[in-house]
Amino acid sequence: MKQKGLRYDGSIDKYPITEGETYILDNGSKIAIADITLGLPEFSKKADCVFIDPAGNKGVLKAYYTKAEKECPVQSFDEFITYIKNCIEQINPDRLFVECFARNKNQIIPMVESLFPCVKIYNNTYYHSSKNECWIVQGSKRPEDWGLEGMDEWDAVFKICKEVPFNAITDFFLGQGLVAEAAYEAGKIFYGSDMNRNRLAVAISRIVKRGGKWTINK
């Protein structure tokens, strides 16, 4: 029996996504289970924009694996950052947005600087509270300012999906689907993956509530 809390809102009962399945929308958006230490889904590599909110330290990362009922294969947080960087290099996007916190800011910023010639750092908040400080680190091929300064990260994601030009956006830590919701509302394609099937089921459910219809490719 699974621990109470790991099932989130219970969407997994209605949308029991499993390894090897891809949930697909009419516009080509896709969601699948994937652990970045084992590789990205091929469809994720077609995105030209990336937004991710990775674990902030080794303890948080280990907790994510525990909630997904998996063993954490990463020995250090620096190793985790290397996996993230490798994924971004495979995608080779035009733009990258990484949400970070005080505990991982000093590792995220140098990573983005190593990937893009132009880096901008926005001061942001989360959970709509000024007490909750975070940053969105933006990497691009030329200087850009998308007006994200001071915004809550939730609102910033919706603004990015609405205003930033891209063919498809990917989030390989999709979780419960903020990027998917924002892209869907903006009428754009998203590619989402996460190692936790229960969290992905919530994302799938949220798109259904917005009118989306999924087909399953096994």
Feature names for model-found ranges:
Residues 1-218:
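Class I S-adenosyl-L-methionine-dependent methyltransferase catalytic core
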